[in-house]
Amino acid sequence: MSLRVSMRAFSLSSRVCARSGSKFSFGDLSKVKLRAPIIPTHKNFDVSPDHPLWAFFPEGNNTETALRSGDELDMNSREWTFAELRRKSFEDLHKLWYLTLKERNILAREVRLAESLRYSRTQQHDALDEKLVTVQKRIKQVLLERQVAHERVQTFTQQQQQYLTEFEERYLNASEHEIVSFNEKLVRLQYAFFGIEPQLQDYDLEDINIKFVEGLSFVANLKVKRYLKQNPAQEQEFELPLNGVVEELPFLLRNVTEAIEEVKALRQSGESVKLDKIDVFPFLRSALSNAIEQEELDQ
């Protein structure tokens, strides 16, 4: 339908032009100047030096040849070992993966170009690509190991938290003749779960980490809860929770009664402050160092 309409319109316009008597003619063609033909060549194209496709060439926009020979390839290189990759951070593995992928893309482009040129000497390109494939497989294996380890830690953390909850309940409900045994278990627990040494002189101040802080909080609050349960009258005078490591540390260094009095004194003097995270480790190292020195002097 539309095709026939357009043909009629064209036919009418032709008739109108013919009836008008207008004549169209070219001028003197001898005066028309023709430019010399432009021979197609890559020099006629201005390619940006930052063009993303330069990434498919080994030297970027400084690459002198589109296809390297086998002698130009680095065949003396070796694959990254598992031991080397396991020491790398996630960021380093990410970078290494994409550097390897980039080199494989460069080799793949050269091999495809060689095939189009019927050039068959690409065995060394393939051999180098196999090394890169091996590196990528090893990176994936290392990441898989980390994922499995993380999942196991998560499972262990859940089991650990369940055990701590059950231990806390048994500790708080222990009778007077049972509490001695539970205190011994608490010492073993704080070392096994949090790395808190039983003896003050055995502390390595450089080993103080987030697990140590978590263990300190668990032990201190557990002892306070037990004390307040045994001394209900103190509940109105002593509020929980403890205000960070400043109030928790005394329960690791002294018996519960002395620690309670020390925390009360800190609160009354206004010295009980919640430290910023960046100040927690330095405070603990300094306080424990002073406590160790004092213990050595007392001996």
From Swiss-Prot:
Similarity remark: Belongs to the universal ribosomal protein uL29 family.
Keyword tags: Mitochondrion, Ribonucleoprotein, Ribosomal protein, Transit peptide
InterPro entries found in the cross-reference section: MRP-L47_sf (IPR038340), Ribosomal_uL29_mit (IPR010729)
Name the UniProt record assigns to this protein: Large ribosomal subunit protein uL29m
Subunit-level organization: Component of the mitochondrial large ribosomal subunit. Mature mitochondrial ribosomes consist of a small (37S) and a large (54S) subunit. The 37S subunit contains at least 33 different proteins and 1 molecule of RNA (15S). The 54S subunit contains at least 45 different proteins and 1 molecule of RNA (21S).
GO biological process, one term: mitochondrial translation
One cellular-component annotation, GO: mitochondrial large ribosomal subunit
Subcellular location: Mitochondrion
Pfam families in the cross-refs: MRP-L47
One example GO MF annotation: structural constituent of ribosome
Gene3D superfamilies on file: 6.10.140.1190, 6.10.330.20
